[in-house]
Amino acid sequence: MDNIAILEALLYTSGDEGLEQKQIIDILDINLNQLEDLVSKYHSHGLTIQRYGSTYVLTTKKETSTYIEQLVKEKSKMKLSQAAMETLSIIAYNQPLTRGDIEMIRGINSDGAVKTLIARGLVEAKDVDHSRSHHLITTDLFLNVFGIENLDALPTTEEDEAEMDEFFSNLVNQKGESNE
């Protein structure tokens, strides 16, 4: 069996979490250049291999998005409250942050929202040298959920306002009916 077929099977088995590039390199006994070559050569009818940070995920091609949106429209997998969405936006644009930093920006206790984001795997707490507080950062799952390869792909204030509105509209569309 060739490495492309094995890579496809590995990524399919790993699901939405994907696999870290080091895992793939170790399992297939290849180097980074060979991995990137496999990813660029991968072709399937409706699937592609996408990189989110250092994680590779088997995902659908962009051309299938309208059909998938119809399917997913009724079943939102990741519903978040308005507070959680605000907190996630603050972390995404200003990371790394402590919980205290977030409270200062929002002007309200955000522990519940932070716990929700950590539980959903969108945010993680990292220990920082010379600090007793955990610093919150977004995860590769955050990149995957919002369809961006890295944090540089987040809209900035210099970009077209319509693009910013669309990004935040997508965030708001993910919010649920519950408080956290």
Swiss-Prot record:
This is Segregation and condensation protein B. GO terms for biological process: cell division; chromosome separation; DNA replication. It comes from the Bacteria. SUPFAM superfamilies: Winged helix' DNA-binding domain. Pfam families: SMC_ScpB. Homodimer. Homodimerization may be required to stabilize the binding of ScpA to the Smc head domains. Component of a cohesin-like complex composed of ScpA, ScpB and the Smc homodimer, in which ScpA and ScpB bind to the head domain of Smc. The presence of the three proteins is required for the association of the complex with DNA. Belongs to the ScpB family. It is found in: Cytoplasm. Participates in chromosomal partition during cell division. May act via the formation of a condensin-like complex containing Smc and ScpA that pull DNA away from mid-cell into both cell halves. Keywords: Cell cycle, Cell division, Chromosome partition, Cytoplasm. GO terms for cellular component: cytoplasm. InterPro entries: ScpB_csome_segregation (IPR005234), WH-like_DNA-bd_sf (IPR036388), WH_DNA-bd_sf (IPR036390).
